[in-house]
Each structure stands twice: as C-alpha cells, then as structure tokens.
UniProtKB/Swiss-Prot annotation:
Family matches, as HAMAP family: Glu_tRNA_synth_type2 (MF_02076)
Name of the protein in question: Glutamate--tRNA ligase
Family per similarity comment: Belongs to the class-I aminoacyl-tRNA synthetase family. Glutamate--tRNA ligase type 2 subfamily.
One Gene Ontology term of the molecular function aspect: glutamate-tRNA ligase activity
Cross-referenced SUPFAM superfamilies: Nucleotidylyl transferase, Ribosomal protein L25-like
Taxonomy of the source species: Archaea, Methanobacteriati, Methanobacteriota, Stenosarchaea group, Methanomicrobia
Domain of life: Archaea
A GO cellular component annotation in the UniProt record: cytosol
Length: 571
C-alpha cells in the first residue's frame, strides 16, 4: 500500500511523541507499536510503516529534546498534553532499588552559573530526602568546569549553600569539581595509554561529517605514544583555543550518533571565576567526563537525573567499562513544567538580569528559590511540593497554586492580620466621633491580642470597592462600624444602626480600611508593584509573614520611616 500524506503525518507525530517522552531519538519498535495500536488502517502493511520510519527517525534524531517538544506542540499539541501529569503526579518517594540502610550515597550536582531555581529544587529536595530515608551520605558537588557557555557565578556557590541551610539540609560533603583538574588529567592519561582516548584536530564540522558517516577521522588510529605527546602539549598551552579535543574512543558505527567518539576535554584559554583556579588551566573537562570520574571517586550508589541525560549514562558507560567500574543505579525523571513560568533556563535568566529586566536573582517575578523565599514561601511547603511530584519518567505539568496551598497551611495559623488599602480613596463618616478601633491580630486566636487604631471621622478605602457602591448602600467597615453611603462625590457616609446580624443576613458588603495617618506600603509581587496605605502596626512585623486582609499573605521585607516594603506570597 502507498501511505497517504495523512498517514505519514500520523507516523511522524507518534515518532516525535516517543522522542519527547524519553528524551532521545525515537525507538522504531515502540513507535511502530503505537502507530499500529492507534491506527487500524495501517495494520495491513507494517512494512510500509517500517520503511517510513527509516526516513522519519533519522531526521528527528538530528534534533534535541527542546526542538522535539517545540515540533510536537506544533503538529500534535494533544500528544504533549497526554505526556503531562496535570493534578496528581506520582506522589511520594518510592523505595530506591537496591538501597541498603547506611550505605546509600547520593549527590546533587548543580552548575553554579546562577542560584537554585525551582527546577533545581526538585533535585535538592528529593536526593537529600532519600539519603535521610536510608541514613546515607549526601554530597553537594558543584559541576563548575564550564568556563564560557555556562560560566560559574561566584556568588552562586554560597547561594546554594544558603538555600540548603534554609531547607534544613547540611550536605555531608561539599565538592568543587574545579578543584580536581589534576585527577581528571591523570585518568585521561590512563585512557590514552589504554588506547581508549585520542587527540583529535578535526574542525567541528569536519568531525561531524565523519561521525554522521560512521567513519573514523584521520586522528582516531594515532598511537597512544603520539596521543600522549599531543596531550601534554594541550596541557602546556601549545595549541590554540579549540584546536584540539580529547575524545573517548567508543563505537564509531554506533546507531546513536551522540555516542560516537564523544568529546571529553577541550582547550579554552579563559579564567575561572574562583580565585583558587583563575588562569591555572587551559584544558577543560566536559561534563560527561568529569561527572563520570566524580561519581566513581565519591562512591555514588544511586543517581537521579533528568531523562534528557539518558545519553550521558551511555557515554559515561564506556569509561566505566574501560576501568572495570560498576555504574551507579540510575533513575531518570521527566521534566517539570510550572504553568506560571513556562520554559526558563538559568542562562537566559542571567542575561535578563544583566540587561536590567529584573532587579536581581530574588526579583519576585523569577522562579528562583531566593525569590520565593523573599516572598514568604516556607521551606517545608517547598519540600512537600517537590516530594509529591514523585520520581517518574512522565513529564509533570503543575501549577504554583499547589505550592501556595501547602504554604497556606503553614502560614495561615501564624500570620497576624492587618489592613492594606491599595489605590486609596478618602471616605468621610459625617457623624462619627473620634474613637479607637480594636481589631484582633488573628481571627481565631484572640489570645494573641489586638491591634488598636485611632480613628477620626475619615478613613481610606480601596477604589475598586467604591466603584461598586451606590447612594443608600449599607456596608460594614470590617471590625469597626456599619455605615450608609450618602454621597459618592465626595465620598461620604453616616453611621448606620443596622445590626451586624441583619447585615450578614442581607449579605451586605464588608470592606477593609486604613486610617488617614497610616504608613505608605509598597507590595512587590509577580505582577509588579502595588502602592497603598497600611496600618502603623505592620512596621513591627519585619521579616515576618502577615496577611493583608482581602489581599493576601505577604512577607515584610523592609521598614523605614517613610515606607514599608512587602513581598506578595499568594492569596
């Protein structure tokens, strides 16, 4: 049979779905099974489908997980949705396969090119929780051997340590990969001597052509002695930037191009931001090489990482095989998409901050741990949020509202209540006498005490509340008095003798308010800044979480004579 254009589109979309799901080139058998299961009309000629896949899959394999997801979202967005877990991810932490109490060693290995993001937080929490579960050893390892593309940010090292402290985690060991160049060089020499690594002088495009054609490049069969000579020249700085690459010799005819003679070291004549390293080295290990050596030297028993790094395990497997090492048990998990932030990377965030688009790494609009901490998100809420995602291959699509719900459980019982009036309008109560309003600090915990506000015959209310009023409207100023609107311009009212019970029965509006002598308050949040007037008592809550009634929970960030700055957490 001849496949129609629609048939080919169907085969293509399922091939892309397979690539997105597993983070690697589509697997023909899996795609074939999916196509046959979903498309009965194609079952009569599996050979035609197989031949189509021989054309489609190599083209897809040229891309990467990001381009695959973009393409799939264009041609079959419903299949993207099918891969995402919407509400209840694979909750909780399942037992680690092969784990023994007291013998588990795990690591979290960030590139410190910026602070921890919400993406990083998953690895920070899950790895440390597993180690705690088994009474093992937890290692924080900074994979900081990329001097240019993902160049380390010096402050980020301390930021990670601070975020771990906030999470209540003290790593058993902190490792800086950039301290271990001599060790990497020693292992590289051993591989060269074994004939398992060689110095390649091909330009990038030339080597790719050899690799794609499954052919050896002219340098692949150079003797170990000559390769050692070139290697020492690389280390001595006798070659120019990117003139030579040390490659691990694998299977040049391997079906997966990503595994063919992959690069382990490159020349970059750049300084490292850590002063201890500076300009000491010109030959830099790539992540797959450095990570493989580190995981062995540190005695890792289990590794959890993204499914987009499945090929890393396969590449590193060659090194482990050559040295006779046992590879750690590895679990790959799916990507996490947080609706409110979409796709983001530390590199793009860093560029935006340097361009002045954000005030810093703790700008409330950013998906960093520093930002959500400043907003008042509690460590236990973040930990529970991350743990409940589970550890599975399926991509997780989740909302910050789930995190906010966990945080609300923690802060609602402890947050004192205050009034904050944004976009304020003056309201005159023509027959009111000066008094002192007494309001509870917490609606269900009166033992905590009360706040007292001196009030004359004028208060401030929100513009959006005023817009809903009419002359004759009877409303309640929360925890103060009942009033009847007598004029909208100017805004005036008189005291009303309607009982509170009658107001409730009539479902009359209850609005909050602020005194004329209140303090200026600026609330910073994901949607931008909002200015208004708040109670003077807010000034006593520096660095604490409060609830601005009818607005939301906020953390009081700064207090001065002129202004209070609060960071919005959530409703």
């Amino acid at each position: 049979m001849t496949l129609s254009p629609e048939d080919l589109k169907t085969i293509e979309k399922y091939a892309y779905q397979n690539a997105v799901k597993y983070g690697k080139a589509p697997q023909p058998k899996a795609v074939m099974g999916k196509v046959m299961g979903e498309c009965p009309q194609l079952r009569s000629d599996p050979n035609a489908v197989s031949e189509a896949l021989k054309v489609i899959i190599p083209e897809i394999a040229k891309g990467n997980p990001e381009t695959w997801e973009t393409k799939l979202s264009e041609i079959a967005p419903e299949l993207i949705e099918a891969l995402s877990v919407k509400k209840e991810p694979d909750k909780g932490l399942k037992p680690l396969e092969g784990a023994e109490n007291g013998k588990v060693v795990m690591r979290f290995a960030p590139n410190p090119n910026g602070p921890a993001t919400l993406g990083s937080a998953r690895g920070m929490v899950v790895n440390s929780e597993y180690v705690k579960m088994y009474g093992g050893k937890f290692v924080l390892r900074f994979d900081d051997t990329d001097p240019d593309i993902k160049r380390p940010l010096l402050q980020a090292y301390d930021w990670y340590l601070d975020d771990f402290k906030w999470l209540g985690v003290v790593p058993d060991q902190v490792v800086y990969a950039s301290d271990h160049f001599p060790m990497y060089y020693d292992y590289a020499r051993k591989l060269i001597e074994m004939g398992k690594a060689y110095v390649c002088f091909c330009k990038g495009g030339d080597f790719k052509r050899f690799k794609d054609a499954k052919q050896s490049c002219p340098h692949r069969d150079t003797s170990p002695e000559e390769n050692l000579m070139h290697w020492e020249k690389m280390l001595a700085g006798e070659y120019e930037d990117q003139q030579a690459v040390l490659r691990i010799k694998t299977d040049i005819k391997h079906k997966d191009p990503a595994l063919r003679d992959w690069g382990a070291f490159r020349i970059r004549k750049m300084s490292h931001p850590r002063p201890e390293i500076g300009n000491k080295y010109v030959v830099w290990p790539l992540l797959d090489f450095a990570g493989a050596i580190e995981d062995h030297e540190l005695g890792m028993t289990h590794i959890i990482r993204g499914k987009d790094l499945i090929d890393s395990e396969k590449r590193q497997g060659y090194i482990y095989k050559y040295f006779g090492w046992k590879y750690p048990r590895t679990t790959n998990w799916g990507r996490v998409k947080i609706h409110e932030f979409g796709k983001f990377s530390t590199s793009t965030l860093r560029k935006a901050i340097e361009a002045g688009e954000y005030s810093g790494w703790d700008d409330p609009r950013l998906p960093t741990i520093r930002a959500i901490r400043r907003r008042g998100i509690q460590a236990e809420a973040l930990k529970k949020f991350m743990i409940e995602m589970g550890v599975g291959m399926t991509d997780v699509s989740i909302s910050m509202e789930s995190l906010y719900a966990e945080n609300r459980k923690i802060v609602d019982p402890i947050a004192n209540r205050y009034f904050f009036v944004w976009n304020p309008v003056e309201l005159e109560i023509t027959d009111a006498e000066p008094t002192v309003a007494k309001l509870p600090l917490h609606p269900t915990d009166h033992k905590r005490g009360f706040r007292e506000i001196a009030v004359g015959n004028k208060v401030l209310v929100c513009t959006e509340d005023v817009e809903k009023l009419e002359v004759g409207s009877i409303i309640r100023l929360k925890d103060f008095c009942n009033i009847e609107i007598t004029s909208l311009s100017p805004l005036q009212a008189k005291l009303s003798d309607v009982s509170l019970e009658a107001l409730k029965k009539a479902k009359a509006k209850i609005i909050h308010w602020a005194p004329l002598d209140g303090i200026n308050v600026k609330v910073r949040g994901p949607e931008g800044d909002l200015n208004g007037i708040g109670e003077q008592g807010i000034a006593a809550e520096l660095d604490k979480i409060v609830q601005f009634e009818r607005f939301g929970f906020c953390r009081i960030d700064a207090v001065s004579e002129d202004e209070i700055v609060a960071y919005f957490a959530h409703k």
